[in-house]
């Protein structure tokens, strides 16, 4: 697993308070991990801070799963 993937998963575990085992690449932040809209905004902000990357609103709306976050960060950092 890549460094980016590990760091994304760590942020998700910390922000959503879910078990690490539940944070799979295909896990949906809302449907599988119980996030609400505020949680998703906070996750995006945490990703921006951790990876020093800007995630525009239109891109943030498309980041629905752990893999979406990993792919965006990998492509833009």
From Swiss-Prot:
GO CC entries: cytosol; membrane
Domain annotation Carrier: ranges: 2-77
SUPFAM superfamilies the UniProt entry points to: ACP-like (SSF47336)
Cellular compartment(s): Cytoplasm
Residues found modified as O-(pantetheine 4'-phosphoryl)serine: 37
Gene Ontology MF terms in the entry: acyl binding; acyl carrier activity
Pathway: Lipid metabolism; fatty acid biosynthesis
Keywords: Cytoplasm, Fatty acid biosynthesis, Fatty acid metabolism, Lipid biosynthesis, Lipid metabolism, Phosphopantetheine, Phosphoprotein
Description of post-translational modifications: 4'-phosphopantetheine is transferred from CoA to a specific serine of apo-ACP by AcpS. This modification is essential for activity because fatty acids are bound in thioester linkage to the sulfhydryl of the prosthetic group.
GO biological process: lipid A biosynthetic process
Protein family: Belongs to the acyl carrier protein (ACP) family.
Function: Carrier of the growing fatty acid chain in fatty acid biosynthesis.
NCBIfam families: acyl_carrier, PRK00982.1-2, PRK00982.1-3, PRK00982.1-4, PRK00982.1-5
Protein name: Acyl carrier protein
Organism of provenance: Paramagnetospirillum magneticum (strain ATCC 700264 / AMB-1) (Magnetospirillum magneticum)
Taxonomic lineage of the native organism: Bacteria, Pseudomonadati, Pseudomonadota, Alphaproteobacteria, Rhodospirillales
Gene: acpP
């Amino acid at each position: 697993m890549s460094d980016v993937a590990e760091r994304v998963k760590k942020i998700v575990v910390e922000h959503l308070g879910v078990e690490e085992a539940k944070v799979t690449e295909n896990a949906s932040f809302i449907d599988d991990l119980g996030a609400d809209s505020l949680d998703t905004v906070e996750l995006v902000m945490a990703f921006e801070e951790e990876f020093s990357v800007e995630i525009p609103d239109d891109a943030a709306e498309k980041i629905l799963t752990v893999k979406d976050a990993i792919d965006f960060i990998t492509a833009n950092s």
